[in-house]
């Protein structure tokens, strides 16, 4: 025979497990880096031209073209958004009618007058605003080359400061025609750009809601 206390403990354990913090997954494309493919074996045909040479031509610019090449992303994001909404409804009704009474009830009540009134009114307003600014630079790696020549890039930068580990991640699709002579491109010119700035450490843990507080927040009816 099972004890009721064991079932209660199991239910409490499941409830607390449901309130546990969900690990946050990165929004950037993985992996963060890619190695270039191995070049073919060198051949010695006995002439100046070597078809197995994997380096860049002498008069070719140094812009990234292949998997493993690096590119500098200039992050310059400034986004402002404002939203407002409102709703207003008003409805009123009034009804009155007489109901004749028959038989011996007529002498008692004569006529019964019935009336009904109703009113319904609703008014609501809402608004939201957001402003985000992110400036900086990060160097990423070409992880894939699409059939049309666009470059899939991703990379991260980690900084260990005292007791906290801060990192910046970036991924997106770059058109090689937008890359400048300094081998850089603005984040506003990157398609499907995903920028992530986060941290791990005591400061980040202090900003996280405790498990017991999340438990009462989930079961609170208000």
UniProtKB/Swiss-Prot annotation:
Lipid-acceptor residues (N-palmitoyl cysteine): 19
GO terms classed as biological process: bacterial-type flagellum-dependent cell motility
Membrane topology: Lipid-anchor
Pfam families, A to Z: FlgH
Keyword check for Repressor: no
Signal peptide from the UniProt entry: 1-18
Lipidation feature positions (S-diacylglycerol cysteine): 19
Subunit record text: The basal body constitutes a major portion of the flagellar organelle and consists of four rings (L,P,S, and M) mounted on a central rod.
Summary of the function given for this chain in its UniProt record: Assembles around the rod to form the L-ring and probably protects the motor/basal body from shearing forces during rotation.
Family: Belongs to the FlgH family.
Record-given protein name: Flagellar L-ring protein
Source organism phylogeny: Bacteria, Pseudomonadati, Pseudomonadota, Betaproteobacteria, Burkholderiales
């Amino acid at each position: 025979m099972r004890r009721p206390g064991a079932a209660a403990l199991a239910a409490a354990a499941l409830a607390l497990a449901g309130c546990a913090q969900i690990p946050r997954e990165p929004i950037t494309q993985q992996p963060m880096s890619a190695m270039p493919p191995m070049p073919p074996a060198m051949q010695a045909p006995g002439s100046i031209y070597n078809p197995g040479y994997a380096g860049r031509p002498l008069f070719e610019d140094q812009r990234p073209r292949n998997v493993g090449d690096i590119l500098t992303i200039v992050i310059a994001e400034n986004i402002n958004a404002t939203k407002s909404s409102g709703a207003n409804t008003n409805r009123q009704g009034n009804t009155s009618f007489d109901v004749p009474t028959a038989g011996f009830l007529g002498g008692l009540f004569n006529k019964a007058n019935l009336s009904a009134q109703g009113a319904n009114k609703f008014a609501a307003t809402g608004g939201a605003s957001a402003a985000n600014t992110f400036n900086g630079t990060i160097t990423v790696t070409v992880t894939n080359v699409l059939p049309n020549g666009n470059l899939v890039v991703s990379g991260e930068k980690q900084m260990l400061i005292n007791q906290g580990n801060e990192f910046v991640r970036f991924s997106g699709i770059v058109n090689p025609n937008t890359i400048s002579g300094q081998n850089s491109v603005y984040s506003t010119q990157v398609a499907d750009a995903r920028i992530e700035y986060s941290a791990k450490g005591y400061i980040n843990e202090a900003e996280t809601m405790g498990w017991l507080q999340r438990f009462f927040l989930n079961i609170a009816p208000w």
